[in-house]
UniProtKB/Swiss-Prot annotation:
NCBIfam families on file: PRK13660.1 (NF010181)
Entry's family note: Belongs to the UPF0398 family.
Source organism per UniProt: Staphylococcus epidermidis (strain ATCC 35984 / DSM 28319 / BCRC 17069 / CCUG 31568 / BM 3577 / RP62A)
Gene3D superfamilies in alphabetical order: 3.40.50.450
Domain of life, source organism: Bacteria
HAMAP family registered for this protein in UniProt: UPF0398
Residues annotated as transmembrane: none
UniProt-recorded name of the protein: UPF0398 protein SERP1017
Length: 188
């Protein structure tokens, strides 16, 4: 039974998404909600993220929205270090502040500002050590920063009984096509 899931994947700019009202964001959020609802039906309690722009913050927004129907779901934001949003523009910082105000738990792995790339690796390892499952939205066809976490995840799974769902663009495309078809049918 999955009690705690870590959701991660592409940063928004790695998907060439620069606005939250882009149609792609809507579909990604619908997909994430779909995945989480299945896990909630099986006893999911916590969703953890590290607070990165893109898949992680969209997932946080989905969790906040799901709380209306699943009030027991909890959102935890565990950042690699303090001040990880300092270089973000005001709009993104305001969005992040709004999300953390609605989170059930917030903490940083390192209680310092950025010191080195090792902080990201240690935060990734923390997530693996403290969750039952990972949803990683990443496709080897579009290589980007999640490739480092994927390598760590695969190695971790080889040594443990940890499980994950690595979501490819094909799976996303199938979901979007099905969603669009069902929405078209509802208008007939």
């Amino acid at each position: 039974m999955v009690k705690t899931v870590y959701i991660t994947g592409y940063k928004s700019f790695e998907l060439n998404i620069y606005k939250d009202d882009a149609p792609e964001v809507y579909y990604l959020k619908q997909f994430i909600a779909h995945k989480l609802k299945h896990l909630l039906d099986e006893g999911l309690e916590w969703v953890l993220i590290q607070g990165q722009m893109g898949i992680e913050l969209w997932s946080a927004e989905v969790v906040i929205e799901l709380k209306k129907d699943f009030p027991d779901i909890k959102l935890g934001i565990i950042t690699p270090f303090i001040g990880h949003t300092q270089r973000w523009n005001d709009k993104n910082q305001a969005k992040y502040t709004n999300i953390i105000q609605q989170a059930d738990f917030t903490e940083s792995i390192h209680h310092t500002e950025y010191m080195g790339a090792y902080q990201f690796k240690q935060a990734d390892q923390f997530m693996l050590d403290h969750t039952d499952y990972t949803i990683l939205i990443y496709d080897d066809e579009q290589e980007a920063s999640p490739k480092y976490f994927k390598a760590m995840l695969v190695e971790f799974m080889e040594k443990t009984n940890y499980t994950c769902d690595i979501v490819t663009f094909d799976e996303l495309t199938d979901f979007i096509n099905d969603l669009q078809w069902s929405q078209d049918q509802s208008f007939e």
